[in-house]
């Protein structure tokens, strides 16, 4: 960074939450030329769900006025629908369980929003993500957020050098409790606002009910892998691998879990027991693999990986393949590894990149996850 802070324009993506509020506050206190932008990515008149976009924007206005920075809203609804929501629906139709937050970061926050910010003279964009960027050895490294319970690098695995060179994560070095404390001490309107846990920009709705607006129910049978019918389901797209709630299978003994889907035959496969062998896999194939360094490793390498957010890292051997693919072999069998979710690679605190889980195997045999 060659310019002095007061000559450096940073455009902050503000959601109306405490994290992005404190990110903007810290940048302002450090002397940057800060602008707050609220991204409107969802048309809340589309269906009858509850959308909090209006009150979130009001919170952004309040916080920006308190901090003393200009603000406005930008509409990315079309890009969100085309790049994120359409992908989300198509993946569910195919029987997979997508991660829209990964796609939202890739296509909206660090593409459409980044491009908009650059068009208004920004030097950098900033967000309230719990992640860190360091420049060393001639390249940008993405590191886990200092708060292990809040680290969000899992969702940022598709970022590369072009984005990281233009991104600041002002709260990445802080614990969540410190962020709340800073907001409270500054009297920010969002200091006590609870964190959102819903899908990126869709909010806190009943998921199955929400999905049914776009993917109508397709009832079918629920079977064991031996072919015994255990009940009926509303549509395989409403269920995910490892799910136990909402199956409606009674009886004694351990609970039942979803272990597979056959989309063509509209069959949901279930098995009994927390440790059922069909819940476990030993390797996967990933597609759309991104390397943060922008360089595909030339040889297989050892690292750790996550197959879902907040999961402890497990040791793996990664075999990079052509066409953005990779084979990942686990040190120990892993439970409920799910096609459509992200697999993300780490070397200590450094996030190396990640991809989308495409196929899952147990001892070389492809599991019954998608027909």
Swiss-Prot record:
The keyword ATP-binding applies. Belongs to the MnmA/TRMU family. NCBIfam families: PRK00143.1, trmU. Its main location: cytoplasm. Residues 150-152, 308-309 are annotated as: Interaction with tRNA. GO terms for biological process: tRNA wobble position uridine thiolation. The keyword Cytoplasm applies. The active site is at residues 104, 200. The record marks 129, 341 as: Interaction with tRNA. SUPFAM superfamilies: Adenine nucleotide alpha hydrolases-like. Residues 99-101 are annotated as: Interaction with target base in tRNA. Pfam families: tRNA_Me_trans, tRNA_Me_trans_C, tRNA_Me_trans_M. It is found in: Cytoplasm. It comes from the Bacteria. Its EC number is 2.8.1.13. InterPro entries: MnmA-like, MnmA-like_C, MnmA-like_central, MnmA-like_central_sf, Rossmann-like_a/b/a_fold. It catalyses: S-sulfanyl-L-cysteinyl-[protein] + uridine(34) in tRNA + AH2 + ATP = 2-thiouridine(34) in tRNA + L-cysteinyl-[protein] + A + AMP + diphosphate + H(+). Disulfide bonds join 104-200. ATP binds at residues 13-20, 39, 128. This is tRNA-specific 2-thiouridylase MnmA. Signal peptide: none annotated. GO terms for molecular function: ATP binding; tRNA binding; tRNA-uridine 2-sulfurtransferase activity. Keywords: ATP-binding, Cytoplasm, Disulfide bond, Nucleotide-binding, RNA-binding, Transferase, tRNA processing, tRNA-binding. Catalyzes the 2-thiolation of uridine at the wobble position (U34) of tRNA, leading to the formation of s(2)U34.
């Amino acid at each position: 960074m060659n310019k002095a802070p007061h000559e450096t324009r940073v455009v902050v993506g503000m959601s109306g939450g405490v994290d992005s509020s404190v990110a903007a506050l810290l940048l302002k206190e450090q002397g940057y030329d800060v602008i707050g932008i609220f991204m409107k990515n969802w048309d809340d008149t589309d269906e009858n769900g509850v959308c909090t976009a209006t009150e979130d924007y009001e919170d952004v206005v309040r916080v920006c006025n308190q901090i003393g920075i200009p603000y406005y809203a930008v509409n990315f609804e079309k890009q969100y629908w085309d790049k994120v929501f359409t992908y989300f629906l198509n993946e569910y139709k195919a029987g997979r369980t997508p991660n829209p937050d990964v796609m939202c970061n890739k296509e909206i926050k660090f593409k459409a929003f980044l491009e908009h910010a650059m068009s208004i003279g920004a030097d950098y964009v900033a967000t309230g993500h719990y992640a860190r960027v360091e420049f060393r050895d001639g390249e940008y490294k993405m590191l886990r957020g200092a708060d292990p319970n809040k680290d969000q690098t899992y969702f940022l695995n598709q970022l590369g050098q072009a984005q990281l060179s233009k991104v600041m994560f002002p709260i990445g070095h802080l614990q969540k409790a410190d962020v709340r404390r800073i907001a409270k001490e500054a009297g920010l309107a969002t200091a006590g606002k609870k964190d959102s846990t819903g899908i990126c920009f869709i909010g806190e709705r009943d998921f199955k009910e929400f999905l049914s607006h776009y993917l109508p129910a397709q009832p079918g049978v629920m079977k064991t892998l031996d072919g015994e019918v255990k009940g009926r389901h509303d549509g395989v797209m409403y269920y995910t691998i490892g799910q136990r709630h909402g199956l409606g299978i009674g009886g004694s003994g351990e609970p039942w879990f979803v272990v597979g889907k056959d989309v063509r035959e509209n069959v949901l496969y279930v098995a009994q027991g927390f440790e059922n062998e069909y819940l476990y896999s030993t390797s996967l194939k990933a597609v759309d693999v991104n390397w943060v360094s922008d360089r595909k490793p030339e040889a297989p390498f050892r690292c750790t990986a996550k197959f879902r957010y907040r999961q402890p890292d497990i040791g793996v051997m990664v075999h990079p393949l052509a066409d953005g693919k990779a084979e990942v072999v686990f040190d120990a069998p892993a439970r409920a590894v799910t096609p459509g979710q992200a697999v993300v690679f780490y070397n200590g605190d450094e996030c190396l990149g990640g991809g989308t889980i495409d196929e899952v195997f147990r001892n070389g045999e492809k599991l019954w996850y998608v027909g």
